[in-house]
Design a protein with these regions (language model features):
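N-terminal presequence-like segments and the immediate start of the first folded domain
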Residues: 1-166, 170-204
Length: 204
């Protein structure tokens, strides 16, 4: 099967793209609701509908990306999210404080946006490592998906980046992975003006 783009919008987005045993969802929001709790429940209800529509399973979610307007809302979202996912098969993922684009005419009250990467081939095993409420790493079809890591023990961005990368060195050794096989990275900084500090430890 090639690449399938489904429910393509006028804005140039596909609601979901299928490729190589994976489903990639565009971020979903629910600005018609006023509170974070209502928006989270509305988004997850919509994903229930979409998973049913496309024949997907919550137990096959590999990776979650959540953008939140207010960091103080994270615990409230987590309570709802962890009740919704399959507790025996939690995904890796990241939750980031960011300002989601406020879409008109859908509304200017977007408090969060949520997207998933989902496995589509039940014949391929999914391995989850260091499982608690979530998991540190998910392995599927020759790919490894890591939960986002932070290192708040030190003060500067450069020191935190170095600390995170040292932790990844340990994890790569633990799981038998190689840095030359890294396909993509995501890094999120509290202060965009400090992003230059990222370069030296990251490129080392």
């Amino acid at each position: 099967m090639g690449i399938q783009h489904l429910d393509v919008s006028k804005g140039g987005y596909s609601r979901v793209t299928f490729s190589k045993n994976l489903a990639f969802f565009t971020g979903h929001a629910a600005p018609q609701y006023q509170t974070l709790k209502e928006q989270a429940e509305g988004i997850l209800k919509r994903y229930d509908e979409l998973f049913k529509q496309f024949g997907l399973k919550k137990s096959n979610i590999l990776y979650t990306t959540c953008f939140m307007k207010n960091a103080d809302d994270e615990d409230e979202f987590a309570d709802i999210y962890f009740q919704w996912i399959d507790p025996k098969n939690p995904p890796a993922g990241v939750t980031v404080t960011a300002l989601p684009i406020q879409h008109s005419p859908v509304g200017d009250n977007i408090l969060m946006e949520l997207s998933f990467i989902v496995a589509t081939n039940d014949s391929l095993p999914i391995k989850r490592y260091d499982v608690t409420r979530g998991c540190r790493m998910v392995e599927y079809d020759g790919m490894a998906y890591f939960t986002g890591h932070v290192y708040p023990k030190v003060d500067t961005l450069g020191e935190q980046v170095a600390g995170v990368l040292n932790r990844y060195d340990e994890l790569f050794e633990k799981f038998g992975l190689k840095k030359e096989n890294v396909i993509a990275t995501n890094g999120y900084s509290k202060d965009g003006e400090q992003c230059g500090e990222n370069g030296e430890p990251f490129n080392a």
